[in-house]
């Protein structure tokens, strides 16, 4: 028997996004070409529902990543993101350590939330985060990728719709989310702000009565 809207508990995350677990990711790179330029930093944050059915950040992971063999390093990109790839204090690990490490966190959250797959949430998801993540997956021949193969939530698009702003810092300002420009272009910091922004938009829609969907 098919569940009606009234029977579905939308305070459970598995019912909010059709069985998908939103996972916010961001990357820092040594260029703009996902196939040739190094992936240098990866951060991810899972989301959950609180007792009132509001979306909030949950677990996080963060990796500094060593350039893959033969990777291109663009000095201008390093100047932009402030990463010193030769600094031993980075504690950089290989892609084949970082990516599976993120998978472990995502699968654990999927099990806890009763979700079947993860779905990437990222700012400008179709460019840096999506392209570089997918390229790294292929390079290390990763097995059992927990994420949907093509569906993503792009917070730039969503923020343009909700707030009239597509730039992360400007969207956060409109959403009353503190943003420290000095910490921007750190994968972890940008992921934290993107997670807050996505949650704010989802929760705003809930408060405005736009979700759950109206019953017939």
Swiss-Prot record:
Name the InterPro entries on file: Exonuclease_RNaseT/DNA_pol3, RNase_T, RNaseH-like_sf, RNaseH_sf
Record: residues binding Mg(2+) 1: 26
Question: GO: which molecular function terms?
Answer: 3'-5' exonuclease activity; magnesium ion binding; nucleic acid binding; RNA exonuclease activity, producing 5'-phosphomonoesters
Keywords, comma-separated and alphabetical: Exonuclease, Hydrolase, Magnesium, Metal-binding, Nuclease, tRNA processing
Disulphides = none
Enzyme class per UniProt:
hydrolase
Q: Which GO terms describe its cellular component?
A: cytosol
The cofactor(s) it depends on are:
Mg(2+)
State its role.
Answer: Trims short 3' overhangs of a variety of RNA species, leaving a one or two nucleotide 3' overhang. Responsible for the end-turnover of tRNA: specifically removes the terminal AMP residue from uncharged tRNA (tRNA-C-C-A). Also appears to be involved in tRNA biosynthesis.
Q: How is the cofactor bound?
A: Binds two Mg(2+) per subunit. The active form of the enzyme binds two Mg(2+) ions in its active site. The first Mg(2+) forms only one salt bridge with the protein.
Where is the Exonuclease domain positioned along the sequence?
Answer: 23-198
Question: What processes does the entry annotate via GO biological process terms?
Answer: DNA replication proofreading; tRNA processing
**Can you name the source organism?**
Mannheimia haemolytica
Q: What is its EC number?
A: 3.1.13.-
The residues that hold Mg(2+) 2 are: 26, 28, 185, 190
Question: Residue numbers for the site described as Important for substrate binding and specificity?
Answer: 80, 150
Q: SMART domains recorded for this chain?
A: EXOIII
- Quaternary context: Homodimer.
Protein name, as recorded: Ribonuclease T
Q: Where is the active site?
A: 185 (proton donor/acceptor)
**Which interval of the chain is the signal sequence?**
none
Which family does the similarity line name? Belongs to the RNase T family.
